[in-house]
């Protein structure tokens, strides 16, 4: 690999501000904020609005849309 052209790949704490969930992973994302992790070490902190901890697809809390009204309206409009 060529020196000085690749971003720094390091451990970073991601904080989902919606669910107040934090997880430690590796990333090239840069930030000026830091936080103290459970192991007592300080890591860069990246705040995110949504992650797998708060996204409806992963949490199973899907918002159900009332489609029965739409179906009835369609049948009523195109009934023969």
UniProtKB/Swiss-Prot annotation:
GO terms for biological process: translation. Pfam families: Ribosomal_L31 (PF01197). InterPro entries: Ribosomal_bL28/bL31-like_sf, Ribosomal_bL31, Ribosomal_bL31_B, Ribosomal_bL31_sf. Signal peptide: none annotated. GO terms for molecular function: structural constituent of ribosome. One of its GO terms (cellular component) is ribosome. The keyword Ribonucleoprotein applies. The keyword NADP does not apply. Keywords: Ribonucleoprotein, Ribosomal protein. Belongs to the bacterial ribosomal protein bL31 family. Type B subfamily. Part of the 50S ribosomal subunit. This is Large ribosomal subunit protein bL31B. It comes from Xylella fastidiosa (strain Temecula1 / ATCC 700964). The lineage of its organism: Bacteria, Pseudomonadati, Pseudomonadota, Gammaproteobacteria, Lysobacterales. The gene is rpmE2.
């Amino acid at each position: 690999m060529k020196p000085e052209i690749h971003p720094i790949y390091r451990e970073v704490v991601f904080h989902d501000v919606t669910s107040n969930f934090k997880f430690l992973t590796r990333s090239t994302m840069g930030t000026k904020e830091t936080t103290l992790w459970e192991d007592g070490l300080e890591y860069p902190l990246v705040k995110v609005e949504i992650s797998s901890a708060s996204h409806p697809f992963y949490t199973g809390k899907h918002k159900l849309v009332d489609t029965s009204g739409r179906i009835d309206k369609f049948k009523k409009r195109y009934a023969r």
